[in-house]
Curated annotation (Swiss-Prot):
The keyword Aminoacyl-tRNA synthetase is assigned to this record: no
Subcellular location: Cell inner membrane
Keywords: Cell inner membrane, Cell membrane, Lipopolysaccharide biosynthesis, Membrane, Transmembrane, Transmembrane helix, Transport
PANTHER family found in the cross-reference section: O-ANTIGEN TRANSPORTER-RELATED (PTHR30250:SF11), PST FAMILY PREDICTED COLANIC ACID TRANSPORTER (PTHR30250)
Described purpose of this protein according to its UniProt entry: May be involved in the translocation process of the nascent O-polysaccharide molecules and/or its ligation to lipid A core units.
Pathway: Bacterial outer membrane biogenesis; LPS O-antigen biosynthesis
Protein name in UniProt: Putative O-antigen export protein
Designated gene of the protein: rfbX
Membrane topology according to the record: Multi-pass membrane protein
Length: 437
């Protein structure tokens, strides 16, 4: 029996993520020893910006993936799509470089102003170094999306794992006498994140160069379609980032370094659960996109029934294992640092993962069929609620309040709206098809 391609892709993602998670866990111990609790807190705040810089392609990666999937479903060539996406992204990256050089003193002061052991110049240098590395890393997103659309997502999963391995090797060889914490933080960023940037650029060149001989690749309609659809994905991604990526920004303004490090360790631990399911959704995206192009929406309902249940089981089982091993995990990652996993936070992180399984599935369904309007309607409200509720919760109740605010933003908005919108959209498409017949 032939194993479905999306299962192979998901399995490769799980394997590579296990490698990456192990490396991230091991790096916590190295970085805590190298930088101390305060220095590592700075490293985690800066590292949280990776998700923001992945938005630097303005949604072109997701748009390109969908367009390639549609063409593959109709047995059409797509070299012009790849080259058009690369041409479109060049001025975008030039703009980001200018913004980084101009705004780094102000952004670094906002993010790192609470870390008094760094002066303004040191904060700005740390931010600029990290920003240029993360911006370069985002270039690889184009190649990864192409491989996913070609049902070769296992390549996109292996490369980040390889980057993590190389980054860990560099980090382990980094000497430090603790005399200059700012330089230690910068060199740690270099060691840990530059491999991902390097492999990302190489991957994109590998996919693009063979297509350069394509004639008439600069089609205005193709370019317009990519940018138009990419704009929708970009808007949604920005709003999603305002929901999911503001936690470290809020904590940098409201909580002490110790709470920030505790949150970082727990989020990485529970993040393994999220990635297991997210990898499955990523591998299913092109499958759903092709099914949508053929109006086979019964496939969506099969996926809904099978994989949401699977996600719930994974969350419950993994959370129980984390509860049993909580002391062991802390002793391995931060020996002698007196950190611990409160039961209240374990319960909240577990419930949050259940909510994410539910909402992320329907978000992927809607994006795979190119229906982003329900996301545009709901996510802005969620973004406002997420930031404000996390801030109020963190100020009044610490980490527990921050997580409660994040979860509440999902329950009030997208957890019910996205399933309703997906079913309504499919019913409308099916009805229109019947009328045409």
């Amino acid at each position: 029996m032939r194993v479905p391609t999306h299962i192979i892709v998901a399995a490769s993602a799980w394997g590579s993520r296990l490698v990456s998670i192990f490396i991230q866990f091991y790096s916590i111990k190295i970085l805590l020893d190298l930088l101390g609790t305060e220095g590592y807190a700075v490293f985690t705040v800066i590292g949280s910006l990776v998700g923001w810089f992945l938005l630097a392609d303005f949604g072109l990666g997701n748009s390109l993936q969908n367009q390639i999937s549609y063409r593959r479903a109709n047995h059409q060539e797509y070299q012009d799509l790849v080259l058009s996406a690369v041409i479109a992204i060049i001025p975008i990256f030039i703009l980001f470089i200018i913004l980084i050089l101009t705004l780094s003193p102000y952004i670094s002061e906002f993010l790192l102003g609470g870390f008094d052991f760094l002066n303004n110049n040191q904060r700005s240098n740390i931010f600029k170094v990290a920003s240029f590395i993360f911006l370069t890393t985002s270039i690889g997103n184009l190649a990864y999306k192409i491989w996913f659309s070609e049902h070769k997502g296992w390549v996109s999963n292996i490369i980040p794992a390889l980057s993590s391995i190389v980054g860990l090797v560099f980090l382990m060889r980094l000497p430090s006498d603790g005399s200059n914490i700012s330089e230690d933080i910068i060199f740690s960023i270099y060691c840990f994140y530059i491999p991902a940037a390097f492999f990302g650029v190489i991957s994109t060149l590998f996919k693009v160069i063979p297509y350069l001989k394509c004639k008439n690749f600069l089609n205005k309609l193709t370019l317009y379609t990519l940018i138009k659809n990419g704009g929708g994905f970009f808007l949604f991604s920005v709003l999603s980032a305002l929901v999911l990526q503001v936690d470290y920004i809020v904590m940098s303004q409201t909580l002490v370094e110790r709470d920030l490090v505790t949150y970082n360790i727990m989020s990485k631990t529970f993040g393994l659960i999220n990635f297991i399911y997210a990898a499955l959704l990523q591998s299913l995206w092109p499958v759903c996109a092709e099914a949508s192009s053929k109006l086979r929406f019964d496939n969506f309902y099969k996926i809904e029934k099978k994989y949401i249940s699977f996600g719930f089981i994974i969350v419950i089982a993994s959370s129980f294992v984390i509860f049993l091993l909580k002391d062991f995990i802390v002793n391995i990652l931060a020996p002698g640092k007196d950190f611990y996993f409160p039961i209240s936070l374990i319960i909240l992180f577990s419930f949050y993962q259940v909510v994410r399984v539910w909402t992320d599935t329907y978000a992927m369904f809607l994006m795979s069929i190119g229906k982003l309007k329900p996301l545009w309607i709901s996510v802005p409200f969620q973004a406002v609620l997420s930031g404000s509720l996390q801030w109020v919760g963190a100020v009044n109740y610490g980490l527990v309040g921050l997580l409660c605010g994040l979860i509440a933003s999902f329950l009030i908005t997208v957890s019910w709206w996205l399933p309703f919108s997906f079913r309504s959209t499919v019913d409308r498409i099916v009805k229109d098809k019947r009328l045409d017949e």
